[in-house]
UniProtKB/Swiss-Prot annotation:
This is Splicing factor 45. Changing Y376A: Impairs interaction with SF3B1, SF1 and U2AF2. Abolishes regulation of alternative splicing. PROSITE patterns: G_PATCH (PS50174). Coiled coil: none annotated. GO terms for biological process: alternative mRNA splicing, via spliceosome; mRNA cis splicing, via spliceosome. Its main location: nucleus. PANTHER family: SPLICING FACTOR 45, SPLICING FACTOR 45 SPF45. SMART domains: G_patch, RRM_1. Splice factor that binds to the single-stranded 3'AG at the exon/intron border and promotes its utilization in the second catalytic step. Involved in the regulation of alternative splicing and the utilization of cryptic splice sites. Promotes the utilization of a cryptic splice site created by the beta-110 mutation in the HBB gene. The resulting frameshift leads to sickle cell anemia. The keyword Translocase does not apply. The modification Phosphothreonine is found at T71, T237. It comes from the Eukaryota. It comes from Homo sapiens.
């Protein structure tokens, strides 16, 4: 007895397991189909009967005159295409007469084309019907009704449509002139022929009417006088009236104090969508004020290691903790070497007390000046600047800054 006798030995069929099963199934199907065909042929030959020729024995005469009528063999009905008894009609092996064959042409394309044409025809009919209804509504809208030949009052929708169309076609509304100009217009004398033409005829007009265009020889002339050249330059009496409304008089200068304007007006932006008009001289003053109010750029031109702080405390407010607190506060900008507090007697309150801070690096001093200048401390605005290092070391602390 061997050591491996109890183990199953694999047969050679497992090696061809991937294709042998399908091949065996095909062979079995072919055998079944062949058996069905042979069985049907044998049954057809057994059940078909052939009758003998018919001989008419009643008629007299010789045997040569006898007529033999041959009739075709009679085949029993229903046995032409027998169905094998071993298979049902629903099995796959039985060939069907209407079985679908993808290689055989069918009417699918014709059916799809017919349905597409039908949908297109239906769509065209709906579109034509909609056009006819629209034309009918348009005719009914313009058609008059009643004895007075007035439009039908029930067509509210048509009236709304006409109203909207009228609003769209109408131009922008003109703004009525101010009442002050109208009042001054009434006060003007009647001996000016051009005044009557330029007067607004109706304030309720919906659209602005352009001025009439004249040839050079037909243009109305303004009256002769000392202000004729000015009126010609100002473009007519309308501009003259506007200037008079804002206080212009012949021979006087423009401006609040009649000083005249030597520079053009400028506009200063105050917000995202707002601004104000500034006279040229005022712009120069504002620019100088801005340069004076922000002298930080001037301070940073000559940096040193010594920072001078003014207006931190008033005269007589210096205590023992001020030096320590100031030094600790300025340690965040860099290492502070020395802190000195000096008070000038008889000086103004914002210049009386000076606090000097000596940093080890110039960069730390610059950070301190940028951060402390303009900062609020105890209700006061701190003034920070640089101080000469040599004068600080010899304790010359009262120099004018």
């Amino acid at each position: 007895m061997s050591l491996y006798d109890d183990l199953g030995v694999e047969t050679s069929d497992s090696k061809t397991e991937g294709w042998s099963k399908n091949f065996k199934l095909l062979q079995s199907q072919l055998q079944v189909k062949k058996a069905a065909l042979t069985q049907a042929k044998s049954q057809r030959t057994k059940q078909s009967t052939v009758l003998a020729p018919v001989i008419d024995l009643k008629r007299g005469g010789s045997s040569d005159d006898r007529q033999i009528v041959d009739t075709p063999p009679h085949v029993a009905a229903g046995l032409k295409d027998p169905v094998p008894s071993g298979f049902s009609a629903g099995e796959v092996l039985i060939p069907l007469a209407d079985e679908y064959d993808p290689m055989f042409p069918n009417d699918y394309e014709k059916v799809v084309k017919r349905q597409r044409e039908e949908r297109q025809r239906q769509r065209e009919l709906e579109r034509q019907k909609e056009i006819e209804e629209r034309e009918k509504r348009r005719k009914d809208r313009h058609e008059a009704s009643g004895f007075a030949r007035r439009p039908d009052p029930d067509s509210d929708e048509d009236e709304d449509y006409e109203r909207e169309r009228r609003k769209r076609s109408m131009g922008g509304a003109a703004i009525a002139p101010p009442t002050s100009l109208v009042e001054k217009d009434k006060e003007l004398p009647r001996d000016f022929p051009y005044e009557e033409d330029s007067r607004p005829r109706s304030q309720s007009s919906k659209a602005a009417i352009p001025p009439p265009v004249y040839e050079e020889q037909d243009r109305p002339r303004s009256p002769t006088g000392p202000s004729n050249s000015f009126l010609a330059n100002m473009g007519g009496t309308v501009a003259h009236k506007i200037m008079q409304k804002y206080g212009f008089r012949e021979g006087q200068g423009l401006g609040k104090h009649e000083q005249g304007l030597s520079t053009a007006l400028s506009v200063e932006k105050t917000s995202k969508r707002g601004g104000k008009i500034i006279v040229g001289d005022a712009t120069e003053k504002d620019a100088s004020k801005k340069s004076d109010s922000n002298p930080l750029t001037e301070i940073l031109k000559c940096p040193t290691k010594v920072v001078l702080l003014r207006n931190m405390v008033g005269a007589g407010e210096v205590d023992e903790d001020l030096e320590v607190e100031t030094k600790e506060e300025c340690e965040k900008y860099g290492k502070v070497g020395k802190c000195v507090i000096f008070e000038i007697p008889g000086a103004p309150d914002d210049e009386a007390v000076r606090i000097f801070l000596e940093f080890e690096r110039v960069e730390s001093a610059i950070k301190a000046v940028v951060d402390l200048n303009g900062r609020y401390f105890g209700g006061r605005v701190v003034k920070a600047c640089f101080y000469n290092l040599d004068k600080f070391r010899v304790l010359d602390l009262a120099e004018q800054v």
